[in-house]
Amino acid sequence: MSSNDEKHAVAIIGSGNIGTDLMVKILRHGKHLKMGAFVGIDPESDGLKRAERMGVPTVTTGIDGLLAHPDFGSIRYVFDATSAGAHARHEQLLRPHGVRVIDLTPAAIGPFVVPAVNIDQHLDSPNVNMVTCGGQATIPMVAAVSRVVPVEYAEIVASISSRSAGPGTRANIDEFTETTSNAIVQVGGAKAGKAIIVLNPAEPPLIMRDTVYCLVPGDASQSAIVESVEQMVDSVRTYVPGYRLKQAVQFDEFKGRMPQELATVRAPRLKVSVFLEVEGAGHYLPSYAGNLDIMTSAALATAERIAARQPVTA
């Protein structure tokens, strides 16, 4: 699609780093989506000022201002890039209007969606949750392993640049770990999971790096796991080009202490280690902010997939 008349109008709530980067992505690369409104609460924020310069309608009074906006009736999709706490209220206010909500906070009111893994299962959901940046990066790897061999336990460590972690990210650290841990099980397919986030203060800033550990049966096919992981990397790269393996998948006999969830397991186990890095596309944010880029890219891919199935006049 090329004409704006043939695209669905969307609103973005949250004028911080994630919301602004998502706006730029939609303006540059939206196939079925166009910007209808950019919503914040600080008129002096860089995001709102940038939206004005780019000709995007702006709202400076938050969700209440969006609902009162004369063009709200044309909005078909709303991206929420605020916080987990704020999203609960936003969802209640938006639900009666029948708009589709793509939640980029850890609120997890709707089902978890990782585009490369389970988007087709939730195309009709009124509210979908994009998990977390660490979840978007690592859960595809857990799913890649679990689709060829049982994963009894998965643990992920997401290391992001401190400079890329804004106030919203820092305020949601607890929600990050809980939401990501739940999604490792619900979407990744592990029997138990744990998530850890590290804010790396290094200067110059380093790009996002993630480590995924999976405990699998000792007789698991290593070649099948490697093939599945490589295929999944290719799938994620269709919407996050900077997503890549940092080195080959590693296999080691697990001789350490079993996680509490597996304390009764005595059979030999194999530890699968996957090392990733995510480089941002640099649309609005620096390339080291791959953690933010993968969230906005996944959200856009999800909304585009949903919108492709719906007529614009619906």
UniProtKB/Swiss-Prot annotation:
GO terms for molecular function: acetaldehyde dehydrogenase (acetylating) activity; NAD binding. The keyword Oxidoreductase applies. NCBIfam families: ac_ald_DH_ac, PRK08300.1. Its EC number is 1.2.1.10. The keyword Glycosyltransferase does not apply. SUPFAM superfamilies: Glyceraldehyde-3-phosphate dehydrogenase-like, C-terminal domain, NAD(P)-binding Rossmann-fold domains. NAD(+) binds at S15, G16, N17, I18, S164, A165, G166, P167, G168, T169, R170, A171, N172, N291. InterPro entries: Acetaldehyde_dehydrogenase, Acetylaldehyde_DH_C, NAD(P)-bd_dom_sf, Semialdehyde_DH_NAD-bd. The active site is at C133 (acyl-thioester intermediate). It catalyses: acetaldehyde + NAD(+) + CoA = acetyl-CoA + NADH + H(+). It is an enzyme of class 1 (oxidoreductase). Keywords: Aromatic hydrocarbons catabolism, NAD, Oxidoreductase. GO terms for biological process: catabolic process. This is Acetaldehyde dehydrogenase 1. Belongs to the acetaldehyde dehydrogenase family. Pfam families: AcetDehyd-dimer, Semialdhyde_dh. It comes from Paraburkholderia xenovorans (strain LB400).
